[in-house]
Amino acid sequence: LEVASVGRSLGDDVAKALLERHPELQDSFLPEIGSIVSAACLAHDLGNPPFGHSGEKAISTFFSEGKGVRLKEKQPNGEQLSPMEWEDLIHFEGNANAFRILTHQFEGRRKGGFVLTYTTLASIVKYPFSSSLAGTKSKFGFFVSEEESFRKIATELGLILLNEHPLKYARHPLVYLVEAADDICYQMMDIEDAYKLKILTTEETKELLMAYFSEERQEHLRKTFLIVNDVNEQIAYLRSSVIGLLIRECTRVFLDHEQEILSGTFEGSLIKRIAERPAAAYKHSVEVSINKIYRSRDVLDVELAGFRIISTLLELMIDAVTLSLIHISEPT
């Protein structure tokens, strides 16, 4: 919900500025950007498995190195996964799974999946290419089963086709705002959660958050803390202030690079182009998250448990299906 709220703020701020810059578009869909980005933010993590990124890794590893390897071979009923389908499994991606959930007509359900607008659907696809282009980071936007659905959406919206085989498009412009909302919120939530779990001390947390601001702004914040002396309230105030700053910075970057974004030549994310001081503070926050939060004993214990749980569930479900196929294929 917080990502959706930040996404709406980003979308509204960008829309307001674009309408001032392009008043001839007053009657277009531009005023709805905030709602579109907010909806995309709510939907974009829908396909993530339990345990988040470690869950994705568990699924990929099960097929690439675990007991799921046997599914690469021809099955008792004569069926065999295509090379592209196998790539989808060994590079399992939550974003691609979200696109599938939102668009696929599952058994007994109405046609069109969740029936979202094409613009909303395109706005969740951060990596608009197939799994064969995923590389070492295992990032891609749609499974081979939904490739034609994405092609239809991309054609209708006029997304720039970069490569036909394997399929690759330039991002929809609003993807950058969805990604920015995600980058902002999850980094701030990681810091706040680490504070609540006592992984970070009060002083460490304050230092991380204060670093985003100029000396003048820091002095103003210190004066505020003389009035608001509850430590938890101070952390919450700092956190919301940083989020506001990052929203303004990402909005500025989007507007400064409007033509590059529209032409499909903009590289990287908005958060990587923000001003020097907040960029340095954000980078330091990421480093602290990696070194002190993601590698903490509690987090690693949960990830290890998740790895075992997902592997066990996959094995049980696949055994149920393959044993059924063997039974069906046996002569009577």
Feature map (PLM): residue ranges:
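Sequence-structural signature of the catalytic-core scaffold of metal-dependent phosphohydrolases
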Residues: 1-39, 46-238, 247
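Charged, amphipathic alpha-helical oligomerization/scaffolding segments
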Residues: 2, 176, 180-183, 242, ...
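Solvent-exposed amphipathic alpha-helical surface segments
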Residues: 13-18, 66, 254-257, 317-320
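Non-transmembrane, amphipathic alpha-helical segments
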Residues: 169-176, 231-242, 270, 294-305
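Long, amphipathic alpha-helical stalk/connector segments used for oligomerization, subunit docking
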Residues: 224-272
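Substrate-recognition/cap regions that form aromatic- and gly/pro-loop-enriched pockets
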Residues: 255-325
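Residue-level detector of conserved catalytic or cofactor/ligand-binding positions
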Residues: 326-332
